[in-house]
């Protein structure tokens, strides 16, 4: 017991007195920074998430760590400033489409001057813009139509827009090419005009071309047409030169010429209705998942007699609803999963074998000259009501027809003979096989 009392007394003597924390004037606790001890510049450099005032509807801002750098969005700037900065410092990757300030044009404004100064133009929704003179585009151009109507008051054959490859387009993300979107090109008067002549890569997105346009799009340096509607035009799209053209999700209705391309063309998920010539393809290309339909043969433009020429008119042949011109250097175009109703397909002389896989030929005619019929392969094709004709000249008889080149030529009459030996023998080859199955189809 005495030993225990000695231990207790020793602990009492060795124990430190309790520390009394007095926080008076000028005294600060451990780890606490007194604000008036910092300068004004130091106080401004403190980083607090509450000071950013960011929209935080999902409550994720507070979960950011201190080592994350938050970049505040910059405001929009004028196109002229971006252009001047690139001329001074060279191309960069810091500018994007959303960084360019949009100019809202009103009816009556000088569109050519606005495009040159601002590049990114927005039209009023549903407004009508009278085009009294040709608009020349030399540099960057992005027009947001908002379903505005562009109505031409121009002489016959004059272009509403002429895109020239003159000025350098600044390095702006998603503004690398000329863009026309959501515009209605109207031509109600008797003057047939050209909507656009382009010598630069151009994108036409969700535009409508209505009325008797002489030529809607004259493409000379490649283009992409997406979701557009062509109604009642003489020629909807014509492509020249070595550049390719791409058409997707578009509608061609009651046009004398739909797509006329002398080079490579890619057409997919589009519809051609009552067009005298839906496609005239001079080079190689791809036609897939499209519909070609003729509902009448007596109404305009289906009653037109058309032709196409080779060698400056030295060789002229009648034009089919789908026409593959002779080209001894190019193969047959890829033709997959298309639907043809009352359509005449003309095939010139080319290399290889033509195989329209997974396509439907309903009440259609495939016409080809001598020596080409044997290169048609109808395996996995719905050809129950399809006729194959071999063409040959019928003497000296000829008629004058409108040509794809814009001139008129004397076209020789042709004699046709039915060919049946190219069909698949269904007594030997069963249709209850994987012949008509595609790996791209969903198994529903």
Curated annotation (Swiss-Prot):
It is found in: Host nucleus; Host cytoplasm. Coiled coil: none annotated. GO terms for cellular component: host cell cytoplasm; host cell nucleus. Pfam families: Adeno_E1B_55K (PF01696). InterPro entries: Adeno_E1B_55kDa, Pectin_lyase_fold/virulence. Keywords: Early protein, Host cytoplasm, Host nucleus, Host-virus interaction, Modulation of host cell apoptosis by virus, Phosphoprotein. One of its GO terms (molecular function) is ubiquitin-like ligase-substrate adaptor activity. Residues 1-27 are annotated as: Disordered. The modification Phosphoserine is found at residues 438-439. Its main location: host cell. Plays a major role to prevent cellular inhibition of viral genome replication. Assembles an SCF-like E3 ubiquitin ligase complex based on the cellular proteins ELOB, ELOC, CUL5 and RBX1, in cooperation with viral E4orf6. This viral RING-type ligase ubiquitinates cellular substrates and targets them to proteasomal degradation: TP53/p53, LIG4, MRE11-RAD50-NBS1 (MRN) complex, ITGA3, DAXX and BLM. E1B-55K probably acts as the substrate-specific adapter of the SCF-like E3 ubiquitin ligase complex. Interacts with host PML-4 and PML-5; this interaction promotes efficient subnuclear targeting of E1B-55K to PML nuclear bodies. Interacts with E4-ORF3 protein. Interacts with E4-ORF6 protein. Belongs to the adenoviridae E1B 55 kDa protein family. This is E1B 55 kDa protein. It comes from Canine adenovirus serotype 1 (strain RI261).
